């Protein structure tokens, strides 16, 4: 018996065509038309389509992400699994958010495209077909939210977009893909390291990101301190090191009780207490700094916003990051 899969469309390049006047891609394809363009889709699953939105993924925000999560949970009793089509610019953020906040354990697979629907060799239809097959597979249950493009399956927690235009743009730079979509089966080589779920009462926290550079002054961090933030991500050099003038401002923010998470701008690897010189992660430990593990700054920002919707206690937030990010 075929599985019932609900495809929820949100927009993105996958639902765009070239505007004949401007020559650029614009939203133009409905959810139903997206599904209709996939050859042989009905042979793999019974598919229904829900059009959540049709916007570029740069327009997504945490409120829309939360609404999407609630839409999926609200339909969970009516489907065996879900596919979410999404623009690739912020796909990894929405997938990560869903992985952190969904109640359902039914398979959820997020996909997109790097070429518009009117482009030569559009990659959207194949990616949708593969994602539907992933969501319909019994092997996908309990794997957390998945991301599937170019027949590779990734954990939402670890995946990232690493090229601006190449269709083969998604990677897990730490552990590699979870599995692969083959012509007749889905094969997983490993399971995700693990995931927990948080259910925030609100998402009103104001969380900024600041990226460090060599010779950076402390004025940006001073401005962050004056902005009445609820939390701050500092994207540091190396394995978690900042210029000395930044460290001084961060210590002040920490003493004022601001939850701060330290991430690294390096694409692969983790923040660690490797050094003890002035500006190292170890030298700032007394400020209450939270280490972000191998989370990117943008995923750490989401996790901090979600955590702040659950608790305002900095030590409880630290415990959440230790469970999720390490």
What kind of region is each of these model predictions?
Residues 1-73, 248, 268, 291:
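ATP/NTP phosphate-donor binding region
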Residues 12-15, 87-92, 152-153, 238-241, ...:
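Gly/Ser/Thr-rich loops at beta-strand to alpha-helix junctions
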Residues 2-4, 8-15, 30-31, 36-41, ...:
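Accessory alpha-helical/coil subdomains and C-terminal extensions
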Residues 110-182:
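Internal gly/pro-rich beta-alpha loop/helix module
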Residues 8-10, 84-86, 109-112, 144-150, ...:
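Short beta-strand segments
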Residues 18-21, 95, 120-123, 154-161, ...:
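Short acidic, glycine/serine/threonine-rich loops at helix termini
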Residues 244-326:
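ATP/nucleoside-binding phosphotransfer catalytic cores, i.e., glycine-rich phosphate-binding loops
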Residues 85-106, 242-251:
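Short Gly/Thr/Asp-enriched flexible loops that form oxyanion-binding sites at enzyme active sites
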